Amino acid sequence: MSSSQQSGRANELRTPGRANSSSREAVDSSPLFFPASSPGSTRLTTPRTTARTPLASSPLLFESSSPGPNIPQSSRSHLLSQRNDLFLDSSSQRTPRSTRRGDIHSSVQMSTPSRRREVDPQRPGVSTPSSLLFSGSDALTFSQAHPSSEVADDTVRVIWGTNVSIQESIASFRGFLRGFKKKYRPEYRNELMPPPDAEQLVYIEALRNMRIMGLEILNLDVQDLKHYPPTKKLYHQLYSYPQEIIPIMDQTIKDVMLDLLGTNPPEDVLNDIELKIYKIRPFNLEKCINMRDLNPGDIDKLISIKGLVLRCTPVIPDMKQAFFRCSVCGHCVTVEIDRGRIAEPIKCPREVCGATNAMQLIHNRSEFADKQVIKLQETPDVVPDGQTPHSVSLCVYDELVDSARAGDRIEVTGIFRCVPVRLNPRMRTVKSLFKTYVDVVHIKKQDKRRLGTDPSTLESDIAEDAALQIDEVRKISDEEVEKIQQVSKRDDIYDILSRSLAPSIYEMDDVKKGLLLQLFGGTNKSFHKGASPRYRGDINILMCGDPSTSKSQILKYVHKIAPRGVYTSGKGSSAVGLTAYITRDQDTKQLVLESGALVLSDGGICCIDEFDKMSDATRSILHEVMEQQTVTVAKAGIITTLNARTSILASANPIGSKYNPDLPVTKNIDLPPTLLSRFDLVYLILDRVDETLDRKLANHIVSMYMEDTPEHATDMEVFSVEFLTSYITYARNNINPVISEEAAKELVNAYVGMRKLGEDVRASEKRITATTRQLESMIRLSEAHAKMHLRNVVEVGDVLEAARLIKTAIKDYATDPATGKISLDLIYVNERETLVPEDMVKELANLISNLTVGGKTMLVSQLLTRFREQSSTRLDASDFEACLGALERRGRIKVITSAGHRIVRSIAQTD
């Protein structure tokens, strides 16, 4: 056998089904081959391959260097057992995973567990695994950063259609991983005295942490590539040709990880690294493109867009490698998927058989990867006036699946793709218009000026996956944590934080304190022994009062910093818009469930303006949301329960645009008592005429137009929005206070004390001044107050402040204008019963006194007849019963039943 035949045989054993055709004549005959202008100059060539297999024509398939004719037969047989699908190595302990990324449609083969180890010529005695195996060329392998003279020639090989040189890209990125330091970043360049960590090798440290923690994802800041001088070209190539550069970076990570092991590493550690599939996830591009600005020039390039997640599909199995078996002879063959297409074998490749149309797809032997489609929409703040928001489809794969939920504000980095659309699903004729989508390689959630999502609303597996794989903006550094802990020890931290919340709004201290505690929130609890599986820790607040009292401004400020917040108006919202609605998917034509405002706000705060303008049908769905924090949907055959674990901040205007202090709150706002009672705090914001207060308010507003900082605030009195959100996020994520025994006793005493406010000296008038909902609200507010002080135990002072806030709110909105006393009957009982005119009650009391003189009694029916006779207007029986009940509660009369008749007696006659 000749040397060329042995070399070809070796190549066939290494990569079955791929021929060796990388001769010099084939290279010189390439249409892209340019002869050098001088004999000593470098020639630029593009390697050509044969089309023996569907994948052999790919521009990224290069054949590894031939092992030569003098390979021992034992080495060949061992290589055969590793590479051929029909032979299994008895020493292998685990099945390797698919080495192809779902987000990168590249035919570059990633490293496998059975990679052949080669000796690094620069480091004798150190065994390093070989790099990518390419078919159809004698190009260098990825592990050979310094090619030997035997293989190197005077040509520069680039990937077809690009200016990407594989060896140059490997060397450049390897040098970046090994040499990039913090001092190259822009924030370190302007420092006269660089900090101690300026010489830190950022990515070497990250790779070491990945090996220790067993991670496979490296988040690459693209700006680091740009500011590192040797990799500026690689930065532009990554932007223009991400499909070719990212697989090279993936393999380089594994090679550097192997280099970091040092001399003679343990075999188990070496095998563990070989079995892992390392992936690079670039982010932080220089420019974030608007969705409506995407154009055909961005196709197959790396882009970055921001938006709001509207819908996430279930996990879709995406086939990566198809397994076919001949139904005649049983011969098996695997075919890799290229951009969603399967090159199904027409005939059996076995020469002995050669049966046509006999290859069957075996699903349980095929390889699948996780895939999910996300619908991303423009955020309302970037939509131009008079236009509807644009949306784009995102395809996420592998670890990024289920990393984003409906309602998340995310920034994604990915490759802009386009695919043809068939004119008819059963025909291959396609339209001239292409459908576009984004293959996501990185997801960055939230905003620096927004709070972090409540971790208690995340499932444990999703939260763990997000913590490991997703780059969170709201990660707080150690320096910020130290500053937060120092600030929390200040005695006036409560006042400073409340002033920092909407500092442009004058005073309203108690309202701001209530909103501040709403942002911190209570603790969500689940008791397996309790009647309810979950007790809410979210706080609901309603602001009602006169117009032009800054209610809407407060809502917008809270919406800007609230996590997963949705801002909506009562008049422009419907029941399905708040909960969920059924729509037909444009791709699958199936009915899908779209999330509404309350479901999108899961784990955040939903701000509803003009709450009183809502229709009754829309308000009725809020009863379940505000107490059970779920939304039950039964539409079009879809029956499900969605989570709506959200705090509600609402504002309402009174009837007639002016609050009447002579009427109770239910008569002023036109809200049902059942809905009003579900708010933890109800604040009345009234526009009272006061010359001194008006002058101070006017001076404050004028000063806001003259300077950005309020007149009464200094740098030490008001925190910035970034620090305020960092403080609240740290408290929400790390502090889970527990009620102490002293605090529990104080809660009981405060509740009993609030109930005693309804007692009268005559011990017969029973006004409701507190219910168990006030007790639960007190618990939530006290937990939020403890969170604000970064305490893990609720103390007595927290309970006292919570009780003070509740009493202050109740004093304003639950005071009976007729008696001037606090009575929750105005809210919890029927409206007609509580709104009986006081003069009618007095007239009935006088009539009873006159008719029961001398200890006489009177039937209720007779009393109603006499009362109607002297009344000038038609008197309903319900109004009469309401007056009778009011007199009985006040201790004026007593109604008894005797022989089936109701009898009225004066209370003075019964004592």
Swiss-Prot record:
Listed A to Z, the keywords are: ATP-binding, DNA replication, DNA-binding, Helicase, Hydrolase, Nucleotide-binding, Nucleus, Phosphoprotein
- UniProt: ATP binding residues: G545, D546, P547, S548, T549, S550, K551, S552
Domain of life, per the record?
Answer: Eukaryota
**GO CC annotations, alphabetized:** chromatin; DNA replication preinitiation complex; MCM complex; MCM core complex; nuclear pre-replicative complex; nuclear replication fork; nucleus; rDNA protrusion
Name positions with the PTM Phosphoserine. S37, S38, S41, S92
Q: Which reaction does it catalyse?
A: ATP + H2O = ADP + phosphate + H(+)
PANTHER family of this UniProt entry?
Answer: DNA REPLICATION LICENSING FACTOR MCM FAMILY MEMBER, DNA REPLICATION LICENSING FACTOR MCM4
Q: What is this protein called?
A: DNA replication licensing factor mcm4
Q: From which organism does this entry originate?
A: Schizosaccharomyces pombe (strain 972 / ATCC 24843) (Fission yeast)
